[in-house]
Amino acid sequence: MKKSAWLPAVIAPVVVAGAVAAPMIANAANDPIAGKNPSAAAVIASIAESSDAQYSGKLEQTSDLGLPELPTGSGGSSLEGDASDVLSLLTASHTARVYVDGPSKQRVQLTQQLAEQDLIRNGSDVWTWDSKERTATHVTLPKEAATPQDGATTPADIAKQAVDAITPSTTVSKPTEVRVAGHDAWQITLTPKASGTLVGTVRLAIDQQTGLPLRATVDAKGQDDPAVQVGFTSLSYGAPAARLFDFTPPTGAKVETKDLSDAGSHAKGDADHHRTDGSRAAGAEPTFTGKGWSTIAELPAGTVDQSSLGDEASGLLGQLTKSVDGGRAVQTSLVSVYLTDDGRVLAGAVPVSALVAAAK
């Protein structure tokens, strides 16, 4: 595994935090809410004000998911080494520099052990760069056409719909004042009503002046330290230097190019979901069962090609997972994953027992 894999590993906790709170992030707009006693809906509505924000900052991500540790040694297989890298990336703390100039210019920069990895977006051009491996990827994004939104048209309407969508399964707290990276923020706490989820609470801190989300914290039940926390430790508003969003691969770098600008490529992508051996590729879309915080995602049979794992991976699976009825599973403090004997994959913020029951 190339070290550029830090990118999904760092982003994964952000996705977790964002996914469980996604209903709260409505496409809304509002005036700054500093100096008031706002409702949760008003704080939610203010988030859209940050869509055009310009800022530079330092972002810190920490995870305490209770993932198993793999023994290291010279005799380990390459797959075991890859898994060790992934686990290290998921469990260790990471600090990244973030530069944002509106919705179409962003740069995330991670520097560690004299190496640098970057994700750079400038309009439709996206680059990733790994200085240690000297590899770069250039992706051309499709041009997005503006799509009018149906339904609610005012911030108040949209915010009300967002709150109404989650209140059946979630208790939403009254905003409280906190300070993050030197900025005053409103913090909202979301608490699942269901007892079957591993999620204890989700806390979102939102800048009082700009609506920019400054910190997201996901707490697991029965655990004192946050399972996932992503937040700014320093933040300065203002347009970053334009040169930060320009990138030219150094001489001798290995460059991979992917052009997604043609809308017709989606058809090819759908076809690629099916392999010639009948199994499903990673792009196969999941189905969902359950509701709210107890939702379970399932990828179909053939998603995991177990025959390709072979003897080399058997020891790896044994260390990462435990044997359960009908397959193997791993449960972290926040998320469980179940690999069935027929190659299905089930995952959710629920105990393994719930996944096993859903698979039957």
What do these predicted ranges mean?
Residues 14-21:
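Hydrophobic, proline/glycine-rich low-complexity stretches
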Residues 2-5, 21-135, 173, 187, ...:
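N-terminal mature ectodomain segment of secretory-pathway/periplasmic proteins
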Residues 142-143, 191, 220, 262, ...:
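A generic structural motif
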Residues 32-49, 62-78, 147-164, 248-288, ...:
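N-terminal low-complexity, Pro/Thr-rich disordered segments
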Residues 1-14:
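N-terminal export and membrane-targeting signals
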Residues 244-344, 348-359:
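Accessory, solvent-exposed terminal regions and/or long lumenal/extracellular loops of proteins
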Residues 132-156:
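Acidic/charged, solvent-exposed loop-and-adjacent secondary-structure segments enriched in E/D, K/R, S/T
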Residues 109, 177-252:
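Gly/Pro-enriched, hydrophobic low-complexity segments
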